[in-house]
Design a protein with these regions (language model features):
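Individual transmembrane alpha-helix segments
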Residues: 150-177
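Extracellular/lumenal N-termini and interhelical loops of multi-pass eukaryotic membrane proteins
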Residues: 37-39, 114-159
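Signature of small four-pass
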Residues: 2-125, 172-195, 200
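Non-transmembrane, juxtamembrane loop and terminal tail segments
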Residues: 202-206
Length: 206
């Protein structure tokens, strides 16, 4: 497969991944499928939305910073069997931006999983308060809340917020890994296309 077809395949593959990352990040603002938590965030000193959600890892990092490079990479691959040297060179830079964005999304998703959601829970004094009850354990160890579903009922509100966050942040984590791999591969593909030139239908170099 020549470099142009590879670029086209990578560009097309990145589109749904970027869109999915944007959707996941937007959904995270509405735990329990309710708008009141995002509207009440920071009112009265209470944070009702998980901090990692507000970092916009999926929206900006895995979304916009991957979607824009995907458009260029896809366009580069449309020019015959493979793109021209200049286009392939530029695709390396765009793919690098995609790597940075997807890594940012990956890191934020990891933090979101490790720290756990912001929710209403009972503190040590049996008072209901907004906070992050699972944040004390910051490692994916056996004691992590991720491996202890029975502890998820610590969160009183939003309803089922732990499951909600775990599912969406896990999806963002997987999307970030796939985007990073595809963008990194395009950097290598673009380098070959830039150095070796373009190929036409009959395998001729331009």
């Amino acid at each position: 497969m020549c470099t142009g077809k590879c670029a086209k395949f990578i560009g097309v593959s990145l589109y749904p991944l970027a869109v999915a990352a944007i959707i996941c990040n937007i959904l995270l603002f509405f735990p329990a499928w309710d708008t009141k938590y995002v509207l009440e965030d920071n009112k009265g000193g209470n944070k009702t939305i998980t901090e990692e959600v507000k970092y916009m890892g999926g929206l900006v990092g895995g979304g916009i910073m991957v979607l824009i490079p995907a458009i260029h990479i896809h366009a580069t691959g449309k020019q015959g069997c493979c793109a021209n040297r200049c286009g392939m060179f530029l695709s390396i830079a765009f793919a690098a931006v995609g790597v940075v964005g997807s890594l940012y999304s990956l890191v934020v998703a990891s933090l979101g999983l490790v720290n756990g959601p912001t929710c209403l829970f009972e503190d040590s004094e049996k008072q209901l308060t907004w906070g992050t009850p699972f944040m004390s354990n910051k490692e994916f160890g056996n004691d992590s809340y991720l491996f202890d579903p029975n502890s998820w009922n610590k969160c009183k509100q939003p309803e089922n917020v732990v499951e909600f966050n775990v599912i969406l942040f896990s999806i963002l984590l997987v999307l970030g890994i796939l985007e990073t791999l595809l963008c990194a591969f395009q950097m290598i593909n673009g380098l070959f296309g830039c150095l070796c030139g373009t190929c036409g239908k009959k395998g001729r170099q331009a």
